[in-house]
Every structure is written in structure tokens, then in C-alpha cells.
Amino acid sequence: MTDQTYCDRLVQDTPFLTGHGRLSEQQVDRIILQLNRYYPQILTNKEAEKFRNPKASLRVRLCDLLSHLQRSGERDCQEFYRALYIHAQPLHSRLPSRHALRKFHITNHACLVLARGGHPSLPLMAWMSSMTTQVCCSPGLASPLASAPPQRPPSGPEGRVWQAQAVQMLVSVSHFLPLPPSLSHGSFHTAWGILYVHSCPSFSNLIPRGSLHVCVDSNLVPTAAWRS
């Protein structure tokens, strides 16, 4: 995903951009005119006239324009995104390709935070909570972000119980980033409401091999936790 080109992004975004009501006639005209006036020209005068022809439907003209840009090369696709940002910024911020890039960067950061033993920021915690793909908890209890965890977890058996109670959500990032075997499964400790995974087979029954999960605190007790 980090090697994704502007042409790749345009292929991914085309179904979204050509959806009903996404771009208005005026916005498409402005984008075409900007690409026509760009030096050296992205669109020739003849091409600009073709893509602005009111005899064809807006969707057909837009599909033809995007197909033309994809064939033209990376620079032309990049300038299209620049024009789209200028003339349709709210739509630009919702592009599927931008969402995919944000997911990659933030999950990559989450993996680095966990690998180094640090703790993520509050925005990162909120994002990880929203991206939950697996749930291992008892239903009907409090939200994981509703109350702050104890500043220092107790030690001994009570600490084991507190740590087990700290688990609510399992957020998998294995879909976005391959991880080293040392992070494929493990035991954990908690700090600031975040559960950090360490390489250890004792927790493999809860965390599948080949994926990394981040656990956010709550009062929920998963039945699989600490089972040996």
C-alpha cells in the first residue's frame, strides 16, 4: 500500500467518484478547465471540449475523463487529484484511497508503539476501538473508555484478575501489515488502559498466530483469558 501510485489510486477511487451525486457538473467543468490550463497541458483544447460536451451525460463524461487520465500516466493522475482537492475538498477527504492510506499509516504506528512497549495516543486509542474486528467479552457491560483504569495494577493473583478484567476489544491489524513471528501471540501487561502483547505462548489461545491485537480496558472478563 505504501507503493500505491496516483494511477493506482484513481483506479480504486473511480467507482466512488462516478457515483450518483458525488461530483456536480460545475465541479467537473472546473477540474477539466484546470487540467486544460495546466502547463504543460494535461488535457488539450480538443480533449477538454470533448469531456465538457453537454450532449453526453455527466457520468459518461466523467468515466471517460478518468479512463483517459489513467492511460496518460502518473503526472496526469497526480494533477487530477490536485484539481479535485481545490474544487471538491470535502469529497477529496472521503476518497477510498485516502482512507486506505490513513489505515495503513495508523496501524503501522500502532504496531511500532506496541513493539517498543510505549502507549498510543488518545486519538489512536479511539481509532483502534472503532476498528474492532473481533470481540471477546461478556455482553451488556460498560464501554472500555467510560472510566479510567487504576493507575497501578495490583500484583500477584489480584493483578492477574485485574489484567484479565482489562480486556474487552481485540483489534486486529493483521489485514494491513505482516508482523514478525515474535509478535504473533503472547502474554500481556496493561498501562493507561492499553494491553500490550509480548511474545509468550501462554496467550496463544486468545490471540491467533499471525495477527497482532490491541486490547482496550474495561470491566469485561473474556472466558478465554488466562486459560492454560
From Swiss-Prot:
Transmembrane segments: none
Keyword Endoplasmic reticulum in annotation: yes
Quaternary data: Associates with BCL10 by CARD-CARD interaction.
Domain CARD intervals: 8-99
Superkingdom of source: Eukaryota
PANTHER family listed in its UniProt record: CASPASE RECRUITMENT DOMAIN-CONTAINING PROTEIN 19
Gene from which this protein is expressed: CARD19
Function: Plays a role in inhibiting the effects of BCL10-induced activation of NF-kappa-B. May inhibit the phosphorylation of BCL10 in a CARD-dependent manner.
GO CC entries: cytosol; endoplasmic reticulum membrane; mitochondrial membrane; mitochondrion; nucleus
Disulfide bond found in the keyword field: yes
Keywords: Disulfide bond, Endoplasmic reticulum, Membrane, Mitochondrion, Nucleus, Phosphoprotein, Transmembrane, Transmembrane helix
Disulfide-linked positions: C7-C77
MF terms in GO: CARD domain binding
Tissues where the protein occurs: Expressed in ovary, testis, placenta, skeletal muscle, kidney, lung, heart and liver (at protein level). Expressed in thymus and brain.
A Gene Ontology biological process term: negative regulation of canonical NF-kappaB signal transduction
Organism: Homo sapiens (Human)
Record protein name field: Caspase recruitment domain-containing protein 19
